[in-house]
Amino acid sequence: MCLLSLPLLLFLQYTRAKAGEVIGGTECKPHSRPYMAYLEIVSSEGYEKDCGGFLIRRNFVLTAAHCAGRSLTVNLGVHNKKMKEDTWQRLKVIKQFLHPNYNSSVLLHDIMLLKLEKKANLTLAVGTLPLPPECNFLTSGRMCRAAGWGRTNVEEPASDTLQEVKLRLMDPQACKHFPNFNHNLQLCVGNPRKRKSVFKGDSGGPLLCAGIAQGIVSYAHRNAKPPVVFTRISHYRPWINKILKAN
């Protein structure tokens, strides 16, 4: 093992929220992030919610485990989620692979693979995103990018268009106020002196560092103040590879 790095849960409601909406960012150039997936979810209780995710194989999307539901539909090639284009590909999820050690109470091992009903067609607007190797060292201070659909401010309604924001990888000490933060399993991201962050709503989107998906949006403060916590993808490469090989 490599030792490196949308309802709220009632018992977490005073400290953190499931994350994903971009605050302090800018609108992406349409279809410049062809790996992005917009997930429409019907929860186990029957209500609708949404998440982000990203295409890693033509028939597999990677996202957060807390985005699981009774049924999921993946939308690819989306820029404005309210404005359907010819670029869209809408695919049903036929199987959800939550990490076997996922803990919903503390949001550890917050990672899930989604198998699609068929392979996506790769186009200029739909493409895959590479993953890091298992032992992949990331230095604090490095600048990365996160993307998602959602609020551009805590009090604002969700954005219809895909937004992105630059975020700094922080020393794990910056996340010590999150009682269950685990540096081996998670990344601490976002300068607390900046009003740039991701927030509740569109969890599951990627943290992109030099063209590689290094993290998955997991949770943040309820007030959206950074830093925020991402699942560290490199730790889960053996599990990801096992699922992909078997399917």
Swiss-Prot record:
SMART domains: Tryp_SPc. It is found in: Secreted; Cytoplasmic granule. GO terms for cellular component: cytoplasm; extracellular space; intracellular membrane-bounded organelle. GO terms for biological process: proteolysis. The keyword Hydrolase applies. Keywords: Disulfide bond, Glycoprotein, Hydrolase, Protease, Secreted, Serine protease, Signal, Zymogen. It is an enzyme of class 3 (hydrolase). InterPro entries: Peptidase_S1_PA (IPR009003), Peptidase_S1_PA_chymotrypsin (IPR043504), Peptidase_S1A (IPR001314), Trypsin_dom (IPR001254), TRYPSIN_HIS (IPR018114), TRYPSIN_SER (IPR033116). Residues 1-17 form the signal peptide. The keyword Magnesium does not apply. Coiled coil: none annotated. Glycans are attached at residues 103, 121. The active site is at 66 (charge relay system), 110 (charge relay system), 203 (charge relay system). Disulfide bonds join 51-67, 144-209, 175-188. It comes from the Eukaryota. It catalyses: Preferential cleavage: Phe-|-Xaa > Tyr-|-Xaa > Trp-|-Xaa > Leu-|-Xaa. GO terms for molecular function: serine-type endopeptidase activity. Its EC number is 3.4.21.39. Residues 18-21 form a propeptide. Major secreted protease of mast cells with suspected roles in vasoactive peptide generation, extracellular matrix degradation, and regulation of gland secretion. Belongs to the peptidase S1 family. Granzyme subfamily. This is Chymase. It comes from Cavia porcellus (Guinea pig).
